[in-house]
């Protein structure tokens, strides 16, 4: 199965979700000074940071990571976290990345996700990576 690459802020919500998946994962560093290189296919799990206007939905660290052409060529899909209290911008980072990187938006979950979200993503990743290998 492919790699999960994720970013999580100090809230650790995304980190807790990814840890519950029990899949091989790598975390994008919070510090912009740290180089982060991905040299294999991956699915990105990203939180959404946006107020009601939709600006700033994708964390800067994720933008920096995907601005590296070598990293970007390995992305195969995106999963986004968000807060449904923000209405239309819920999970907006997934929409933005899916569109810009031309990859499927695979799943959206709230905050740190439920047990059902974890099960859905685990099962979905198994199916997704099986199809990717065909």
From Swiss-Prot:
Pfam families: Flavodoxin_NdrI. GO terms for molecular function: FMN binding. InterPro entries: Flavoprotein-like_sf, RNR_Ib_NrdI_bac, RNR_NrdI. It comes from the Bacteria. GO terms for biological process: protein modification process. SUPFAM superfamilies: Flavoproteins (SSF52218). Belongs to the NrdI family. PANTHER family: PROTEIN NRDI. HAMAP family: NrdI (MF_00128). This is Protein NrdI. The lineage of its organism: Bacteria, Pseudomonadati, Pseudomonadota, Alphaproteobacteria, Hyphomicrobiales.
């Amino acid at each position: 199965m492919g790699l999960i690459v994720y970013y999580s802020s100090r809230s650790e919500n995304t980190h807790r979700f990814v840890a519950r998946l029990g899949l091989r994962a790598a975390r994008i560093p919070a510090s912009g000074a740290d180089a982060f290189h991905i040299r294999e296919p991956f699915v990105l799990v990203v939180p959404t940071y946006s107020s009601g206007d939709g600006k700033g939905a994708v964390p800067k660290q994720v933008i920096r990571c995907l601005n590296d052409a070598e990293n970007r060529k390995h992305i195969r899909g995106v999963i986004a976290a968000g807060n449904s209290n923000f209405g239309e911008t819920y999970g907006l980072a997934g929409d933005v990345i899916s569109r810009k990187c031309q990859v499927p938006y695979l799943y959206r979950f709230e905050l740190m996700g439920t047990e059902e979200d974890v099960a859905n993503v685990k099962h979905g990743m198994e199916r997704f990576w099986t199809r990717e290998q065909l």
